[in-house]
Amino acid sequence: MKTSRLPIAIQQAVMRRLREKLAQANLKLGRNYPEPKLSYTQRGTSAGTAWLESYKIRLNPVLLLENSEAFIEEVVPHELAHLLVWKHFGRVAPHGKEWKWMMENVLGVPARRTHQFELQSVRRNTFPYRCKCQEHQLTVRRHNRVVRGEAVYRCVHCGEQLVAK
């Protein structure tokens, strides 16, 4: 989905939230961190990604459309917090104590590592594999690696190699 297919009102709400939280952080931290670049090119089941070196936030337009209010309230500050932590502390654990502090004490948002959005519309096809204790669903990428002989996957519970059903 291209940015142009995302309603302008939603894009504006995202920018408002981003700017509001950035201003709040700059005030509390006594800094003047710049506004990050924003794109709507994230794909798959991730709601967003913070690209530290390029100081950019990628958001998933499908999940944003389907969960606008929660997405804007939670995901936008979540990704902004990653960039602010990187600027403020340098390279640290992605969801470590610095990120949690930035989320809760600076941005005033509950620090949750993962979203709870329905993923049916963005979930890719999977391929069934088995071990001796359960069935597993491998992504297209992992399935293709098995088919090409580039990878072998094992069950984390029983340790047995996964085989296609």
From Swiss-Prot:
The chain positions of domain SprT-like read: 20-163
* Record carries keyword Zinc-finger: no
Instruction: Report the co-factor binding details.
Output: Binds 1 zinc ion.
InterPro entries found in the cross-reference section: SprT-like_domain, SprT_Zn_ribbon, Uncharacterised_SprT
Q: Where is the active site?
A: 79
Q: Under the GO molecular function aspect, what terms does this record hold?
A: zinc ion binding
Cofactor needs: Zn(2+)
Q: Where are the annotated coiled coils located?
A: none
Supply the alphabetized keyword list.
Cytoplasm, Metal-binding, Zinc
Q: What is this protein called?
A: Protein SprT
Organism this protein belongs to: Shigella boydii serotype 18 (strain CDC 3083-94 / BS512)
Q: Which gene encodes it?
A: sprT
